[in-house]
């Protein structure tokens, strides 16, 4: 039976109104909210809008990297259209090379002359050949083109600590100072790179080695000890829990908390979550699966709240970040594709899921200081899809475009009382919100209506803010599974929204069904 969700009051105070089936009505009770612009919260780190690129399906090859000899327009082997699209949404950080792939990846396979690099089988994802033509130098070349922070995941599952230590030295040692620095120079890059984040393994409870929490914590201490950046601070991110594995968080924080800078949390939204081989379709789904998707998405609030409470016990100063470095929707693969490639379409439903998650992260900016949606191109809840020379921006991409003002902005308290969206046994608050003040002093408000049928009248009382105008952009559509395709790339795109009014310190509007709206207050 789908779970009934009750959210923490910080995010919104829900008021149950009506009975199941009420979602079919055209009218809706009002949403009321209070925005306290004079009570600033934590800064939302820009890396909360990070991305994830794994050697999986067409996530790297064909999606980002086509090689210098490709007929597809490219800049040194990187797809020109993909680079331009990612830069346009200010991608702040990219995690690489995995994922499960990371704990089978040996960094030396991906350096040196491309023709001399060994070909191996990607046993995690699809059983295809991996020619290692995209390696360390190519990854940093991508980061340089994007102007993004670097997040390298080290192999703990099948490699010794010395391999991680040597990789860090290869990447960060000053020119000419060590044997590995000289090797890097011979391979074409004399200057060292900056590694902002080092992942100490991936999912050590699963594909990273099927470990017990205490054993994983001991290994984390060991690998963290020997991984030393030669050119400044490198934040070490431990392999943390999956969804509600609170015992894992307790063990990692208790045993290794003093030696790490972050703990990774992974959680994927599935419409059907009883059987991993039956997740539900990306398109053509019934409303019930829209509802369960929203309910399961909103569980992120519970997971972050409970994991943060455990972390607070060992780290009351909140030095160790909670890094939600794998999140997003996971559906059954597109029929006819390699199931190991995790290809799926991306619809308006995914846009709403993205907005809900970003709002949750914003409310937990004191602990959640980095996140990475899975994944950036062609895999799972992708920002971009490619097919040969063609590229399309997904609804999720456009949500990231709307939320650009949130990067590095200060979160503002917004409390919300919302009607409930009901479908069969599922009941969830219909509207989610977050608000920020950017570095220039402008206030922005995001509102997400997850009810697919009803528009919501919204009234926001504002304090500490002298706004007189509100305008912005909205993402919505006529169908729950409205999506962009290569033949129709603009079905779901942001549209101007001018239906908001500001008078006497109060913001009023009607929020369309199944929509993500960002308003700029002036």
Predicted regions and their residues:
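Active-site His/acidic residue clusters
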Residues: 268-291, 337
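Bacterial N-terminal signal peptides
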Residues: 8-16
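Extracellular loop and loop/strand-boundary signature of outer-membrane beta-barrel proteins
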Residues: 291-293, 345-346
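Bacterial N-terminal signal peptides that target proteins for export
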Residues: 1-9
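Histidine-centered catalytic micro-motifs
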Residues: 265
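N-terminal signal peptide c-region/cleavage motif recognized by signal peptidases
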Residues: 18-20
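Non-catalytic accessory regions flanking glycosidase/transglycosidase catalytic cores in CAZymes
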Residues: 23-262, 300-301, 305-333, 337-522
């Amino acid at each position: 039976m789908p779970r009934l969700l009750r959210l923490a009051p910080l995010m919104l105070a829900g008021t149950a109104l009506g009975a199941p089936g009420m979602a079919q009505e055209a009218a809706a009770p009002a949403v009321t909210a209070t925005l306290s612009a004079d009570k600033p919260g934590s800064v939302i780190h820009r890396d909360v809008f990070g991305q994830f690129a794994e050697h999986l399906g067409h996530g790297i090859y064909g999606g980002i990297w086509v090689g210098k000899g490709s007929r597809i327009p490219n800049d040194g082997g990187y797809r020109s259209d993909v680079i331009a699209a990612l830069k346009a949404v200010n991608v702040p950080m990219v995690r690489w090379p995995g994922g499960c792939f990371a704990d089978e990846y040996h960094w030396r396979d991906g350096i040196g002359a491309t023709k001399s690099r060994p070909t191996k089988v990607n046993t995690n994802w699809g059983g295809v050949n991996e020619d290692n033509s995209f390696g360390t130098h190519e990854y940093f070349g991508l980061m340089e083109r994007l102007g993004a922070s670097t997040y390298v995941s080290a192999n703990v599952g099948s490699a010794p600590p010395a391999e991680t230590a040597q990789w860090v030295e290869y990447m960060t040692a000053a020119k000419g100072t060590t044997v590995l620095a000289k090797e890097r120079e011979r391979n074409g890059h004399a200057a060292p790179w900056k590694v902002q984040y080092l992942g100490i393994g991936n999912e050590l409870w699963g594909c990273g080695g099927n470990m017990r929490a205490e054993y994983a914590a001991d290994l984390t201490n060991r690998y963290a000890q020997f991984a030393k950046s030669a050119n400044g601070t490198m934040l070490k991110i431990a392999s943390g829990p999956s969804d509600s594995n609170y015992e894992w968080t307790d063990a990692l924080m208790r045993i290794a908390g003093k030696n790490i800078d972050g703990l990774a949390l992974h959680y994927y939204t599935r419409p059907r979550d009883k059987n991993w081989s039956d997740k539900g379709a990306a398109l053509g789904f019934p409303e019930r699966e829209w509802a369960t998707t929203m309910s399961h998405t909103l569980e992120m609030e519970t997971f972050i709240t409970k994991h943060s409470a455990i972390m607070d016990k060992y780290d009351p100063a909140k030095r160790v970040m909670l890094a939600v470095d794998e999140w997003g929707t996971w559906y059954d693969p597109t029929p006819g594709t390699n199931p190991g490639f995790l290809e799926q379409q991306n619809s308006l439903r995914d846009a709403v899921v993205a907005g809900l998650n970003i709002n949750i992260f914003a409310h937990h900016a004191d602990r959640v200081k980095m996140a990475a949606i899975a994944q950036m191109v062609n895999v799972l809840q992708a920002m971009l899809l490619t097919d040969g020379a063609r590229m399309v921006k997904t609804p999720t991409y456009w949500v990231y475009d709307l939320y650009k003002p949130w990067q590095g902005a200060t979160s503002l308290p917004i409390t919300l009382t919302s009607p409930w969206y009901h479908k069969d046994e599922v009941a969830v608050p219909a509207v989610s919100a977050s608000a920020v003040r950017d570095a220039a002093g402008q206030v922005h408000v995001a509102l997400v209506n997850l009810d697919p049928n009803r528009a919501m009248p919204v009234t926001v009382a504002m304090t500490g803010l002298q706004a007189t105008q509100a305008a912005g952009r909205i993402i919505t559509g006529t169908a729950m599974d409205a999506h962009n395709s290569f033949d129709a790339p603009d079905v779901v795109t942001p549209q101007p929204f001018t239906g908001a009014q500001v008078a006497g310190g109060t913001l009023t509007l009607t929020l369309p069904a199944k929509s993500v709206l960002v308003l700029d207050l002036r």
